[in-house]
């Protein structure tokens, strides 16, 4: 099943995997949140679980603040900070509904959370304490940090662009260019735009600069669709992760496939083998050498028998991730 460039992590979560995130400066450590109410820290090269801590409900997202501190939130409405060296935890604060997204913004040194309570909250990680609550038009489904910009995707196909240095007003209000519900948004490492995916096998490449000549460059494409018995099956695109160096990106869908795309030449660079079940989350390491792939059933067909959830660690090459020079 797995080749020499890929292996499966031992001691995976016991229920669905919600998020995988690499440590900011090394591909050695991977943080994993799960519906089994745990957050796990893995030593990837050693293929061992270093540490595990619990919430009182499913954990929907997690993020590193720095190499020794993990933040996480989920269905128990609680935002936790966990010291990965001392195994001490701190309840930082709460939302009024489940916390869907947890991200760190290094340029402004704030943690950002997005919730189904229709707010985004900023947190000062040094104290740690709440540094502001900002209303969103609908439930927050996904968010991504781009320099000092924050891109928020909500229910109702809305996209909001905020300036994390001045949250007094929304910089841009947009509507998704895709017809169906937004599943994931990730910002380009070059800070020029973002990629948005929907539940209907489509991805949009968008640019932040509102000028007409830049907006002309935006486009969308179909993906994660399979012909079965001459019928096209269309799958949600659940996960996006950017390669920090090349500005190419990987997508993962409920079809069990991972694709890597070159947004500049509008080409697919590669497709990996089919994984046992839906791709729930993806993360490139900071140096772009490693991709963590969460293969985890997302209950698209309700509670049927399904393959066990797993995290695959894949070494990726420049041939798979670098734009082809024209």
From Swiss-Prot:
The modification Phosphoserine is found at residue 211. Disulfide bonds: none annotated. It holds the Pfam family WD40. GO terms for biological process: cell division; chromosome segregation; meiotic cell cycle; mitotic spindle assembly checkpoint signaling; regulation of chromosome segregation. SUPFAM superfamilies: WD40 repeat-like. It comes from the Eukaryota. WD repeats lie at residues 5-43, 46-83, 86-124, 128-163, 223-262. One of its GO terms (molecular function) is ubiquitin binding. Poly-ADP-ribosylated by PARP1. This is Mitotic checkpoint protein BUB3. It comes from Bos taurus. InterPro entries: G-protein_beta_WD-40_rep, WD40/YVTN_repeat-like_dom_sf, WD40_repeat_dom_sf, WD40_rpt. The gene is BUB3. The modification N6-acetyllysine is found at residue 179. Has a dual function in spindle-assembly checkpoint signaling and in promoting the establishment of correct kinetochore-microtubule (K-MT) attachments. Promotes the formation of stable end-on bipolar attachments. Necessary for kinetochore localization of BUB1. Regulates chromosome segregation during oocyte meiosis. The BUB1/BUB3 complex plays a role in the inhibition of anaphase-promoting complex or cyclosome (APC/C) when spindle-assembly checkpoint is activated and inhibits the ubiquitin ligase activity of APC/C by phosphorylating its activator CDC20. SMART domains: WD40 (SM00320). Interacts with BUB1 and BUBR1. The BUB1/BUB3 complex interacts with MAD1L1. Interacts with ZNF207/BuGZ; leading to promote stability and kinetochore loading of BUB3. It is found in: Nucleus; Chromosome, Centromere, Kinetochore. Its main location: nucleus. Keywords: Acetylation, ADP-ribosylation, Cell cycle, Cell division, Centromere, Chromosome, Chromosome partition, Isopeptide bond, Kinetochore, Meiosis, Mitosis, Nucleus, Phosphoprotein, Repeat, Ubl conjugation, WD repeat. There is a cross-link at residue 216 (Glycyl lysine isopeptide (Lys-Gly) (interchain with G-Cter in ubiquitin)). Belongs to the WD repeat BUB3 family. GO terms for cellular component: bub1-bub3 complex; kinetochore; mitotic checkpoint complex; nucleoplasm.
């Amino acid at each position: 099943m797995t080749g020499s460039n890929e292996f499966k992590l031992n001691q995976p979560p016991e229920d669905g995997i919600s998020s995988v995130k690499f440590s900011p400066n090394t591909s050695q450590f991977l943080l994993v949140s799960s519906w089994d109410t745990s957050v796990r820290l893995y030593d990837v090269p050693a293929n061992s679980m270093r540490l595990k801590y619990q919430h009182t409900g499913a954990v929907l997202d997690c993020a590193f603040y720095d190499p020794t501190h993990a933040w996480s939130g989920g269905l128990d409405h609680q935002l936790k900070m966990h010291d990965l060296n001392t195994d001490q935890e701190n309840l930082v604060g709460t939302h009024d509904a489940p916390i869907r997204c947890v991200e760190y913004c290094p340029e402004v040194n704030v943690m950002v959370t997005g919730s189904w309570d229709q707010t985004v909250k900023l947190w000062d990680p040094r104290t740690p304490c709440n540094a502001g609550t900002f209303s969103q038009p609908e439930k927050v489904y996904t968010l991504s940090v781009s320099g000092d910009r924050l891109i928020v995707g909500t229910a109702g196909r809305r996209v909001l662009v905020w300036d994390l240095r001045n949250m007094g007003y929304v910089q841009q209000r947009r509507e998704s260019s895709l017809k169906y519900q937004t599943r994931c948004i990730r910002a380009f490492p070059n800070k020029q735009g973002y990629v948005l995916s929907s539940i209907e096998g489509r991805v949009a490449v968008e640019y932040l600069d509102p000028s007409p000549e830049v907006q002309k460059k935006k486009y969308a494409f179909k993906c994660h669709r399979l012909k079965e018995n001459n019928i096209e099956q269309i799958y949600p695109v659940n996960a996006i992760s950017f390669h920090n160096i090349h500005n190419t990106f990987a997508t993962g869908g409920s079809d069990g496939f991972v694709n890597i795309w070159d947004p500049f030449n509008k080409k697919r660079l590669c497709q990996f083998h089919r994984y046992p079940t839906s791709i729930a989350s993806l993360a490139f390491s900071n140096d772009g050498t490693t991709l963590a792939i969460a293969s985890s059933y997302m209950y698209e067909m309700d509670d049927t028998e399904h393959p066990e959830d797993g995290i695959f660690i894949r070494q990726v090459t420049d041939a798979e991730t670098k734009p082809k020079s024209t």
